[in-house]
Amino acid sequence: GTLVSLKWDWFDSEENLWRIPPETSGLKRKMGEGEEHLLPVSPEMRRLMDELFEINGCYEYVFWSPNGKNHPYLNRETINNHITNLGYKGRLTSHGWRDVIVTSGQEELKFPLDIILRQIGHTEHKQGTSGHYDNTEFLPERREFVNQWSLKLVNNGLKI
């Protein structure tokens, strides 16, 4: 849900990361609670973003909709419809990529679960007594994770 509603002004080009407000739909944070979700960007992703900005940087949303009067950004089901059209109906959804990232991140890239869960926006670490004090972001580790994840995709044939 959060992906299609990304706004260009949430991107911090100096830090090379997204700063997603806590109240953004899909983050499962209550209004007024929590911190912004920081998402480091790999060099490969940055190149894609720069190309996309050349095309639609004049719009508020990264994935703006040509039907902007009714909805300013792509419908949340657009990605799932594309996955279906690629022949993965019943086997993969946009939300299902989280399973792929968590599993592959641990098994193939050997990253700890805490790093991966923070990258995908989960807040389990904030539960319980110790969670009240846990404000770790693991940004350097997460940046390394997204760099390795991007390289894995490129090495497996993704064209950027």
Which residues does each predicted region cover?
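C-terminal catalytic core of tyrosine-transesterase DNA break-rejoin enzymes
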Residues: 1-2, 74, 78, 85, ...
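Active-site-proximal structural scaffolding
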Residues: 1-4, 11-13, 32-34, 42, ...
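Generic hydrophobic alpha-helical scaffold/packing signal
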Residues: 4, 50, 80, 103-106, ...
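Conserved tyrosine-mediated DNA breakage-rejoining catalytic core shared by Y-recombinases
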Residues: 4-51, 124-126
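Catalytic-site neighborhood detector that most strongly recognizes the C-terminal catalytic loop/helix
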Residues: 20-27, 46, 110, 120-158
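Short, contiguous acidic/charged loop-to-helix segments that flank catalytic cores in large enzymes
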Residues: 23-38, 64-71, 88-96, 105-107, ...
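Active-site/catalytic core of tyrosine-dependent DNA strand-transfer enzymes
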Residues: 40-90, 100-101, 109
